[in-house]
Amino acid sequence: MGLTAHDRQLINSTWGKVCAKTIGKEALGRLLWTYPWTQRYFSSFGNLNSADAVFHNEAVAAHGEKVVTSIGEAIKHMDDIKGYYAQLSKYHSETLHVDPCNFKRFGGCLSISLARQFHEEYTPELHAAYEHLFDAIADALGKGYH
């Protein structure tokens, strides 16, 4: 299912409250700790051998912020998310060889981080809207693999 007008409205009305630095660090840290095989893409980040090391790693924090900032920019291009992510998709597929399933996994981790931030405001309806967005982004980033 694609993004509906209502999804877009919900996302646009809440994304401004997201702190890319905080949410990015938490979501990427959660991905790296929950799915340890994803750490192979981040060997330059140094020690990722414990939860404490992952969640206090400055490179994890910086990259998480970069990813969430990119999602904020993608929200401005919801009519053409595939176009927005075309070059990044190519880079992830041809240069980094990232397993495209990891994009979906990151979306799940990001959903958890958003739920922790928004609490009661993160209704099932808002959760669904963000899942639709993260699915569209995962699809766009995975496009280079097809």
From Swiss-Prot:
Protein transport as UniProt keyword: no
Oligomeric and partner information: Heterotetramer of two alpha chains and two beta chains.
Superkingdom in the source lineage: Eukaryota
Family matches, as SUPFAM superfamilies: Globin-like
Keywords associated with the record: Heme, Iron, Metal-binding, Oxygen transport, Transport
Sequence positions that bind heme b: H63, H92
GO cellular component, one term: blood microparticle
Upper classification of the organism: Eukaryota, Metazoa, Chordata, Craniata, Vertebrata
Record protein name field: Hemoglobin subunit beta-1
Transmembrane annotation, as ranges: none
Family: Belongs to the globin family.
GO terms of biological process kind: hydrogen peroxide catabolic process
Tissue: Red blood cells.
Domain Globin: 2-146
Entry function: Involved in oxygen transport from the lung to the various peripheral tissues.
Keyword Membrane: no
